[in-house]
UniProtKB/Swiss-Prot annotation:
PROSITE patterns: ANK_REP_REGION, ANK_REPEAT, CNMP_BINDING_3, KHA
Domain KHA: 859-935
Protein name (record): Potassium channel AKT1
Gene: AKT1
Organism: Oryza sativa subsp. indica (Rice)
Compartments, record wording: Membrane
GO cellular-component term (any): monoatomic ion channel complex
Keyword field contains DNA damage: no
Name of one Pfam family that matches: KHA
Superkingdom of the organism of origin: Eukaryota
Topological domain spans for side Cytoplasmic: 1-106, 158-178, 227-240, 334-935
Role noted for this protein: Highly selective inward-rectifying potassium channel that mediates potassium uptake by plant roots.
InterPro entries reported in the protein's UniProt record: Ankyrin_rpt, Ankyrin_rpt-contain_sf, cNMP-bd_dom, cNMP-bd_dom_sf, Ion_trans_dom, K_chnl_volt-dep_EAG/ELK/ERG, KAT/AKT, KHA_dom
């Protein structure tokens, strides 16, 4: 027991007897769930008192059924609360926000309603306790007696420090000095009260009136219900007002009858004058009559059939009617406020409509503009009245919740927009978080032709038409529907909007600000390149529109001339199938063997797409026809897979040899697809059928596993080895026996017998290999070059723009503020900030760090003081320090081992060397002090 008690104390925490739960601690002890609710962390004690870790089943139950009061009523942390521990209340101390304690309080409120009705009734109509009613009173009193005891164990909120006080002594002292006396007095049984009171005060209900003290619980209940989102505020307020009215009528009726019942002359009372034998009448008739007079007095109707007959009743009526004045004012004020609040939106809408109409008439606006004004105001009222104030709601939420909502609603829609095809999910998530949903009524202008490009829109629902003004008349150029984007050309190219965008029906649009968009793209240059490619491709498809054709012509002209310092790669040009741009890039000295992160070169992409002109250009500029990617694939294999015969011929003439790639992989793929034509092509262009994959599996292994007799026979005809083992030691012959392929076993036996008798000649796979036609040509090794287009000055650099018609022509747009200019500036800034890590961007926009030679020409001076050479020699910096030491050995006929600066610091990395540095090559025996002395 001692050990168990120690464990319990450890679980409750070593915080001492006067420990109090802070506001920040209490808030951290409640975990807010996604459904807007929270659950209290287990506290010590039987009411959610865990033993340190807590019961998982209990936690799940609390999590599922936790009340929203934990958020609306729980303690909020003070600013800068530093406590990060989960404080637990003391043993046997109950949190006032515990779910089960809330249930207990709700149950007591039901008993309070009973007490509120029965206490005045017993006081006015019942002379002494009788049977069932007395028993029910005692049962109710017993429950409230339990609550008195329980209150001594409920923590309270200190109003000064806003901390939960869980010290039992302080809890007891606070309760004893506040409400304990009234709670005990209202719980005393009526029988006991009659015995202790004087004879003149031994009325059955006199002491019971103290139970009305419990009504304070009902007031707190209505306060909570008014804040509860699950209950309608209007009906909660109405229910509260009705309860107040009924309680006032009930109490007044009981007091009216009490005055008549206790008056010495029964006939001189309000009820005796109307009903002389009222004592003989049933309790129900007497109660209904009393309520009738009470409610007629409350409503000031006053039929005159019942009225005060003596002084006592007159005095009571005076105070009752004064009370009625205040109650009536309270009721009318509350109901007026509720009704006015419900109609305020309609009143504001009518006022706004009237003001807009007057404005249009006063300023003689065209009818179309007036209709647009009225439609917009009407739509705004409709969205507000139907609870669609989406932007106001989103703006009131934290950024994380707002982003999650936007992603859930619009992510898939934005992902399918042509402009963002192929970009990363991170970019789409950032864009969606910045978008704002808006509603537009039919026939409203969203974008005006020639206005400044500030926003572009994505259609969520509805349709819009693109209108161009020609000869003073509007002509519909195109109709856009859900999932399409409008206004993007003006925003991305930073030019006046080309068209007027007008809604055809009720539309929901996503608006994205140009500044926010370019800010996001500037930090995602690779994705910006993809967006640029998608835009150009879209514009090229709009050949029928002269305006769009002019835009794409100007963009491509600037790209080809190199006027934009953009991260354009050969892969980018080949992916678009733009042989003109590819030729311009190659003429400017870009490496034809540059690759992306997967090792794909431009020749790989051109071969797979079957673009003969791009393949021819790349081969002419020295692209390696046998370049391998990370999977061992070569361009010739890409062309064979796609059945591009002309490209295959070009590659073979350029020296392509399939054996440079992973022919084992190729043969296995052909067998898996059961493609005899592809397998014959592999063998014809230099593939070895006996070559294994990385796991040791050959094509014959694959054919046996698939039970493909046709492919196995074809492989055997070209020299496949039936006894070659894979990585696990299995041969094709053993696999055929193990898997029970009788046809293949028979084929193997017949082939072996024919080979042994010498009657069958097995052709070697090398006998059919095609000799390269251009093997003598020297090929440049493939490396990851920097795909950067240099700025070059041309005579035609200032050609006028031919995009807009003559009558709409503006001054020439420099594109510095367009998407292209932003990407260009961002790329240049990155190179300035990181000169040692310059790299290209592949067609997908992913960074491709340079793994080849240094692109910048760096000249350094090297000297060897040990050989008496201090003047030095000017040389180009090699790629590595080892190569630099080898160069020094050749220049000075000396074997240096270290590279030092003139100050004597040793150089460990070649990237630390800058253009113009003076380097000293020395051996391990060299004394740095000698160099300092000489210097």
């Amino acid at each position: 027991m001692a050990r168990w008690g120690a464990a319990r104390m450890a679980a409750c925490g070593p915080w001492g007897r006067n420990r109090r739960v802070g506001a920040g601690d209490a808030f951290e002890a409640s975990e807010v769930r996604r459904d807007g609710r929270s659950r209290m962390m287990p506290a010590c004690g039987p009411w959610g008192a865990g033993h340190g870790g807590g019961d998982p089943a209990l936690e799940r139950e609390l999590s599922r059924d936790g009340s929203h009061y934990s958020i609306s009523s729980a303690i909020l942390p003070s600013l800068g609360a530093r406590s990060n521990r989960r404080i637990k209340l003391r043993r046997f101390i109950i949190s006032p926000y515990d779910r089960r304690y809330r249930i207990w309080e709700t149950f007591l409120i039901v008993l309070v309603v009973y007490s509120a009705w029965v206490s005045p009734f017993e006081f006015g109509f019942i002379p002494k306790p009788t049977g069932a009613l007395a028993t029910a009173d005692n049962v109710v009193n017993a429950f409230f007696a339990v609550d008195i005891i329980l209150t001594f164990f409920v923590a309270y909120l200190d109003k000064m420090s806003y901390m939960l006080e869980d010290d039992p002594k302080k809890i007891a002292w606070r309760y004893s000095t506040t409400w304990l006396v009234l709670d005990v007095a209202s719980t005393i049984p009526s029988e006991f009260a009659r015995r202790i009171l004087p004879s003149k005060l031994r009325s059955y209900g006199f002491f019971n009136m103290l139970r009305l003290w419990r009504l304070r619980r009902v007031s707190s209940l209505f306060s909570r219900l008014e804040k509860d989102r699950h209950f309608n505020y209007f009906w909660v307020r109405c229910a509260k007002l009705i309860c107040v009215t009924l309680f006032a009528v009930h109490c007044a009726a009981c007091f009216y009858y009490l005055l008549a019942d206790r008056y010495p002359v029964p006939t001189s009372t309000w009820i005796g004058n109307y009903m002389a034998d009222f004592h003989e009448r049933s309790l129900w008739i007497r109660y209904v009559t009393s309520v009738y007079w009470s409610i007629t007095t409350l409503t000031t109707v006053g039929y005159g059939d019942l009225h005060a007959e003596n002084t006592r009743e007159m005095i009571f009526n005076i105070f009752y009617m004064l009370f009625n004045l205040g109650l009536t004012a309270y009721l009318i004020g509350n109901m007026t406020n509720l009704v006015v609040h419900g109609t305020s939106r309609t009143r504001n809408y009518r006022d706004t409509i009237q003001a807009a109409t007057s404005f249009g008439v006063r300023n003689q606006l065209p009818p179309r503009l007036q209709d647009q004004m009225i439609s917009h105001i009407s739509l705004k009222y409709r969205t507000d009245s139907e609870g669609l104030q989406q932007q106001e709601i989103l703006d009131s939420l934290p950024k994380a919740i707002k982003s999650s909502i936007s992603q859930y609603l619009f992510f898939h829609l934005v992902q399918n927009v042509y402009l963002f095809q192929g970009v990363s999910n991170d970019l789409i998530f950032q864009l969606v978080s910045e978008m704002k949903a808006e509603y537009f009524p039919p026939r409203e202008d969203v974008i005006l032709q020639n206005e400044a490009p500030t926003d572009f829109y994505i259609l969520v629902s509805g349709s819009v038409e693109l209108v161009e003004q020609q000869n003073g008349a509007d002509q519909v150029i195109q109709v856009a529907t859900s999932g399409e984007v409008v206004g993007e050309i003006g925003v991305l190219c930073y030019r006046p909007q080309l068209f007027t965008v007008r809604t055809r029906s009720l539309c929901q649009l996503l608006r994205l600000n140009r500044t926010a968009f370019l800010s996001i793209v500037q930090s995602n240059v690779g994705d910006g390149t993809i967006i640029m490619n998608n835009l150009i491709q879209f514009l090229k498809e709009q050949k029928e529109n002269s305006v769009m054709a002019g835009v794409v012509k100007e963009i491509e002209s600037m790209l080809a001339r190199g006027n934009l310092d953009l991260p354009i790669t050969l892969c980018f040009a080949v992916t678009r199938g733009d042989d003109f741009l590819l030729h311009q890039l190659l003429k400017r000295g870009m490496d034809p063997n540059e690759s992306d992160n997967d090792g794909h070169t431009a020749l790989h992409i051109a071969a797979s797409k079957g673009n003969e002109q791009c393949v021819r250009l790349l081969l002419e500029y020295g692209a390696d026809p046998n370049a391998r990617d990370s999977e061992g694939k070569v361009p010739l294999w890409e062309a064979l897979c796609e059945k591009h015969a002309a490209v295959v011929q070009l590659l073979v003439e350029g020296g392509a040899d399939l054996s440079s790639g992973d022919t084992g992989l190729y043969a296995c793929i052909a067998v898996e697809e059961s493609d005899t034509e592809l397998l014959n092509d592999i063998i014809h262009y230099g593939g070895d059928v006996n070559r294994a994959r990385r796991d040791g599996t050959t094509a014959l292994h694959r054919a046996v596993c698939d039970g493909n007799v046709q492919m196995a026979e074809l492989l055997l005809e070209h020299g496949a080895d039936i006894d070659k083992q894979d990585g696990n030691g299995w041969t094709p012959r053993a696999l055929a026996e193990q898997q029970g392929h009788d046809d293949i076993q028979l084929l193997f036996r017949s082939r072996k017998a024919a080979t042994a008798s010498g009657h069958h000649h097995v052709p070697s796979s090398t006998t059919t290999r095609v000799a390269p036609a251009a093997a003598a040509a020297s090929l440049i090794g493939r490396f990851n070059s920097e795909p950067m287009m240099k700025n070059m000055i041309h005579e035609d650099a200032d050609l006028p723009s031919r995009v807009l018609p003559e009558k709409l022509r503006r001054k020439r747009v420099t594109f510095q503020n367009s998407l292209f200019g932003v990407i260009s500036s961002s790329q240049a800034q990155r190179e300035t900030d990181h000169p040692l890590s310059r790299g290209g961007l592949a067609a997908t926009g992913s960074p491709n760090p340079s793994s080849g030679s240094r692109n910048a020409v760096i000249r350094v001076t090297i000297s060897c003081p040990e050989k008496g050479n201090t003047a030095g020699k000017l040389v180009l910096l090699p790629q590595t320090l080892d190569m630099l030491l080898e160069l020094g050995a050749k220049k000075f006929d000396f074997a240096p081992t270290k590279v030092l600066t003139v100050e004597g610091a040793e150089v460990d990395e070649v990237e630390l060397i800058r253009d113009g540095d003076h380097l000293v090559l020395v051996s391990d025996e060299w004394d740095a002090e000698k160099m300092k002395g000489k210097s």
